[in-house]
Amino acid sequence: MSERPSSLSFERIADRYDATRGGEQRGRRTAANLASLLDPAAPVMEVGIGTGIVALGLRELGFTVLGVDLSPAMAQRARRRLGPVVAVADAAQLPVADATIQQAVSVWLLHLVADRAVVLAEVARALRSGGRYLCTAWGRVPPRDEVERLLFDMRNQLDPTGGWRDDERQVLDAARSAGFTVVDQRVASLGEVPQSPAEVADKIEEKPWSYLWDLTDAQWRAVVAPTVAALRALPDAHLQRRYDMPLRIIVLQRR
């Protein structure tokens, strides 16, 4: 697989990905929400398998899972969990023949790829007619409090196009053009995440999220540093708040 310059690999964060993304617990919760939408008798390909936390959850529920990831280091960690069923490959160049996959899933992938329309078309190529593709989208959900508002505004300043939000409408339009029918859309819960504003500020400075990786010093000073300062200046900044983590699932079927 050739890595295109605009494709985003998580190679640099593979060693701390699980610790910053909820690990196997969140993977199991995600898998539980996907399971009822999949055929337990058919293998599942996870496109963008990462370290395998969701795939592990699906396997524990009785599914046969295989997957691909752009990052060799992430794929290596997935193999430790799942065995030799993980390949290094680009979501835009899947290493499978036409119409050979029965069902596929992608969790938190489409906002990271160079061109979601290309990836959706590639998954459609690989799926059999009638096969399902479950994917997730961030959507356009308004911030629920001042912490989320500060994060929302920061991301909008860093990406004024709003592409990071992975708007459902954009995903659905691209999916239909790729040969999919929209079967279902739903919002599930991955449970509550306790965090204080100060903890969020600390996490930002650790740069765990991909949109923080390649900022210039000027961007950091102009956008990120003021956000960190504002988070720490909130009243009771060291008191934890509880946030429900939504999982917005789109169910597509290959025509």
Show where each model-derived region lies.
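Short catalytic micro-motifs in class I SAM-dependent methyltransferases
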Residues: 108-112
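Conserved class I S-adenosyl-L-methionine
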Residues: 1-42, 53-57, 74-77, 132-163, ...
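Conserved Class I S-adenosyl-L-methionine
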Residues: 51, 166, 181-255
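A conserved beta-strand element that flanks and buttresses the S-adenosyl-L-methionine
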Residues: 105
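Class I SAM-dependent methyltransferase SAM/SAH-binding core
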Residues: 45-47, 51-93
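Short alpha-helix
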Residues: 163-178
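A short glycine-rich, Lys/Arg-flanked "PGG" loop and its adjoining helix->strand segment in the class I
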Residues: 117-129
